[in-house]
C-alpha cells in the first residue's frame, strides 16, 4: 500500500546574516516533526531554504563592497552549514535566486495581472526595510514598525497592487470552517480581529526604488515584492507551473500539510499567502503553525541588542543533541521560551547526564559486572515488573497524542518520564542487593533485561528529537532499530544478546563556572559608561480615603491571558481585548493604546479586576479592568505575573 504523504515546510531564512539559535529553533522543530512522521510511516517531504531578495540585502551587500549575489551566496551557505550541523533531515533546500524559482515567480505575477488581481498604481506610505513591509501612518507604533520596533522611512513610488479585498470574505469563511488552519488559537484570533474583520487594504506587490529582486518581465523597472517572491517557494520548490505543466511531485504533495513559521510572520502566511493561492486557484495549506520565540534571558535575540547566541557556539560547548534537546524541550506551545548558558548547563547535568546518561551507564555496567554483558530474560517476574511494563507500553501513545497536536516539548517530557521510571525501577529492585544472593541470580537477570528493554523503547521514541543519541544508545545495547509499531510489545530485545563491554559516556557533566568563563572569552562584555548617581525616581500621589479589609475583600483579582486585541475605531486611547480568565473569555476595553499596540497585547498574561460591574466605553461593553502602573510622565506599564501562571489564577 502506498504511504500517505506529509509535506512540511519551514519559513525560508532571510539571508541578511548568520542565523542565531532563535532562528535555528524552527528548523530543529520542523525536523523533529518530520522525523516523527517518518517513524509513523508517512512519506515525508521536508522543505526549507533561503529568502535572498530585497532592499535590505542590496544595502548589506553595498556595505560589504560585494554584489548582492555574492552576499547571499555567502550567507545562504552559512545557513545551510548550520542546518546540516544541527542534523536536520530536509529533503529540499530551495534558494529564491534559483533560476527555476525566479522564472515561475515571473509567470505567477503575470497570471495574477492577467486575471485582474494585480493592477498598476502609486504607493505612498511608510516602509520598514528590515521587515520588508509596508505600513500606513496609523499602523505605526510611536512612529516605528509595529513588528520590529525600528524606524520606518517614507516611500513614494509607482507600484503594482494586489486586490486583497477581493478574496477577504472567502478567506474569513475558510478560516471559520477550518478551525485547525491557524494554530495556536490565539494566532487565529489575532489575524481575524486585527486584520481581516476590520478590512484589508490592497497590497503593494512591486518596487522600483531598488534593483535586487525578480524583475516583472512585462515591466522590468519593477521588481516583485519580496513576500510574493518568498511565499511562492512552497509551490515552486516542488515543481509548480502556473501554465499547467506542474510536476508529478507537486500534484502529489500539494497542499502542504504544515507550514511551520515564527509568530512574527504569521500575517504573511495566513492572509497574504492564502489569498495568493486563491488567485492561482490552488488549495490552501492544511495548517499554519506560528511558533513562539526563543528568547535570550528576557528579550528577543537581536544582533543590534548584542544578546545573540549562535547554534554552532552552543554545539561546541554541549554537542548537537544536547542543543536539540534544549530548544525542543524548553519551548512552550504558545508562550516564548528562554535560553541562557546557566539553564543549558543545568539541563545537561540534570536531565541528560544524570537521568538518561547515568541510567544507560549503570545498566550496561551492571550487565557486565554480573553477567559478562549477556542480557537474558529468565522470566522471574514480580508485580513491580508488571507496573514497569504497563508504564512503558503507555508512553508511545502519549507521545503520539502530543505530537499530533504539535506539542513537541510535551512529547519529549513523556519520553523522559520513561527514563525516570526506569531509574526508579533500579531503586525499587536494587540489583546490587540481588547480586549478593546466588538464589536470586535469575531474578537479577530478569531485572537487567527489563532495564535494557525499557531503555531500547525509550531510545526509539527519542529518535525524532535526538537521533544521534538514539544511535549511540542502541549501539551500546547491541539493539536493533525499532518501529513505533514494535513499541506495542514489551520484550522484543533478543534474550542472550551481549551489550558493549565499556559503556560510552553519553553526556559529560559540565562545570558552570568554567562554561561561563569560556563564554566571557568568546563574547567579552562591553564596558558601559558609568553614569553619575541620580536621585531615586519616586512618585508621591494624593492619598485616597482608607478602606476596611472587608471593602478590599469585595474586589476579585485574577490572571488573564489576552487571546485577541484590536483598536477601537474613532478612539485615540482605547484597545478592546478578549481576555481568557479560566474557562471564560471576557471583553475588556482599556485606555492604553498610546502605550501598547494591539499586536503587542496578544498572548500577554495580565492582572485583571474581574468583578467590576460591566460598563460601556465608546459604546463597547467592558467586563473588567486590566491593571497598569503609571509613572510621573503618564507612561503606563502592564502589571504582569512575575512567574508563569495559568489564566484564571487568583491574585491574593
For the regions a language model picked out, list residue spans one by one.
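A glycine-rich helix N-cap at a beta->alpha junction
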Residues: 76-91
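Phosphate-backbone binding interfaces of nucleic-acid-interacting proteins
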Residues: 531-652
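Beta-strand segments within the central parallel beta-sheet cores of soluble alpha/beta enzyme folds
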Residues: 287-290, 474-476, 576
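Structured secondary-structure scaffolds
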Residues: 1-48, 100-104, 154-369, 411-415
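Intrinsic disorder at enzyme termini
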Residues: 470-551
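Helix-rich, typically C-terminal accessory recognition domains appended to large enzymatic cores
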Residues: 120, 343-381, 391-499, 609
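Cys/His-rich short segments
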Residues: 115-168, 172
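N-terminal catalytic cores of NTP/NDP-binding nucleotidyl/phosphoryl-transfer enzymes
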Residues: 2-75, 94-109, 114, 131, ...
Amino acid at each position: 500500500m502506498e504511504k500517505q504523504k506529509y509535506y512540511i515546510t519551514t519559513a525560508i531564512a532571510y539571508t541578511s546574516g548568520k542565523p542565531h539559535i532563535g532562528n535555528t529553533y524552527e528548523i530543529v522543530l520542523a525536523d523533529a516533526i518530520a522525523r516523527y512522521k517518518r517513524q509513523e510511516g508517512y512519506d515525508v517531504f521536508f522543505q526549507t531554504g533561503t529568502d535572498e531578495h530585497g532592499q535590505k540585502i542590496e544595502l548589506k551587500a553595498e556595505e560589504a563592497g560585494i554584489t548582492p549575489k555574492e552576499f547571499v551566496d555567502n550567507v545562504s551557505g552559512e545557513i545551510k552549514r548550520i542546518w546540516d550541523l544541527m542534523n536536520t533531515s530536509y529533503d529540499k533546500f530551495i534558494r529564491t535566486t534559483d533560476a527555476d524559482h525566479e522564472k515561475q515567480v515571473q509567470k505567477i505575477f503575470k497570471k495574477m495581472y492577467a486575471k485582474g488581481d494585480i493592477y498598476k498604481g502609486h504607493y505612498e506610505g511608510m516602509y520598514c526595510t528590515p521587515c520588508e513591509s509596508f505600513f500606513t501612518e496609523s499602523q505605526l507604533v510611536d512612529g516605528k514598525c509595529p513588528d520590529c520596533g525600528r524606524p520606518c522611512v517614507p516611500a513614494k513610488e509607482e507600484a503594482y497592487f494586489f486586490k486583497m479585498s477581493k478574496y477577504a470574505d472567502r478567506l474569513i469563511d475558510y478560516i471559520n470552517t477550518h478551525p485547525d488552519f491557524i494554530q495556536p488559537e490565539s494566532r487565529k484570533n489575532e489575524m481575524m480581529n486585527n486584520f481581516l474583520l476590520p478590512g484589508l487594504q490592497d497590497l503593494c506587490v512591486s518596487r522600483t526604488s531598488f534593483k535586487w529582486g525578480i524583475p516583472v518581465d512585462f515591466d522590468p523597472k519593477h521588481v516583485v515584492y519580496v513576500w510574493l517572491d518568498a511565499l511562492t517557494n512552497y509551490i515552486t520548490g516542488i515543481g509548480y507551473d502556473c501554465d499547467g505543466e506542474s510536476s508529478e511531485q507537486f500534484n502529489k504533495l500539494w497542499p502542504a500539510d504544515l507550514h511551520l513559521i515564527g509568530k512574527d510572520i504569521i500575517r504573511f502566511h495566513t492572509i497574504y499567502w492564502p489569498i495568493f493561492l486563491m488567485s492561482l486557484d490552488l488549495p490552501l495549506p492544511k495548517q499554519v503553525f506560528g511558533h513562539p520565540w526563543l528568547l535570550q534571558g528576557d528579550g528577543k535575540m537581536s544582533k543590534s541588542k548584542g544578546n545573540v547566541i549562535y547554534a554552532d557556539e552552543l554545539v561546541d560547548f554541549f554537542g548537537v543533541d544536547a542543543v536539540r534537546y534544549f530548544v525542543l524541550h524548553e519551548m512552550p506551545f504558545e508562550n516564548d521560551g528562554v535560553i541562557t548558558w546557566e539553564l543549558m548547563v543545568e539541563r545537561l547535568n540534570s536531565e541528560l547526564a544524570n537521568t538518561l546518561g547515568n541510567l544507560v551507564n549503570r545498566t550496561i555496567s551492571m550487565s557486565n559486572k554480573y553477567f559478562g554483558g549477556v542480557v537474558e530474560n529468565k522470566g522471574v517476574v514480580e508485580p513491580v515488573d508488571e507496573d514497569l511494563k504497563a508504564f512503558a507500553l503507555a508512553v508511545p501513545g502519549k507521545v503520539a497524542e502530543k505530537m499530533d497536536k504539535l506539542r513537541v516539548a510535551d512529547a519529549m517530557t513523556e519520553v523522559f518520564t520513561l527514563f525516570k521510571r526506569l531509574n526508579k525501577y533500579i531503586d525499587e529492585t536494587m540489583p546490587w542487593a540481588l547480586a549478593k544472593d546466588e538464589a536470586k541470580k535469575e531474578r537479577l537477570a530478569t531485572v537487567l533485561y527489563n532495564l535494557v528493554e525499557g531503555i531500547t523503547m525509550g531510545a526509539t521514541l527519542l529518535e525524532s528529537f535526538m537521533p544521534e543519541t538514539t544511535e549511540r544508545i542502541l549501539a551500546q545495547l547491541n539493539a536493533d532499530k525499532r518501529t513505533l509499531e514494535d513499541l506495542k510489545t514489551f520484550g522484543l530485545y533478543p534474550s542472550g544478546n551481549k551489550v558493549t563491554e565499556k559503556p560510552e559516556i553519553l553526556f559529560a557533566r559540565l562545570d558552570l563556572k568554567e562554561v561561563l568563563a569560556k563564554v566571557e572569552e568568546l563574547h567579552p562584555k562591553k564596558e558601559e559608561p558609568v553614569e553619575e548617581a541620580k536621585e531615586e525616581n519616586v512618585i508621591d500621589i494624593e492619598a485616597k480615603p482608607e478602606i476596611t479589609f472587608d471593602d478590599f475583600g469585595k474586589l476579585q483579582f485574577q490572571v488573564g491571558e489576552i487571546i485577541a486585541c484590536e483598536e477601537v475605531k474613532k478612539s485615540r486611547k482605547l484597545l478592546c481585548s478578549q481576555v481568557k480568565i479560566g474557562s471564560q473569555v471576557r471583553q475588556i476595553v482599556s485606555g492604553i493604546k498610546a502605550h501598547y499596540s494591539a499586536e503587542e497585547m496578544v498572548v500577554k498574561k495580565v492582572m485583571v479586576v474581574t468583578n467590576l460591574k460591566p460598563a460601556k466605553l465608546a459604546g463597547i461593553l467592558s467586563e473588567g479592568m486590566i491593571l497598569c502602573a503609571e509613572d510621573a510622565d503618564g507612561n503606563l506599564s502592564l502589571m504582569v505575573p512575575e512567574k508563569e501562571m495559568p489564566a484564571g489564577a487568583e491574585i491574593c
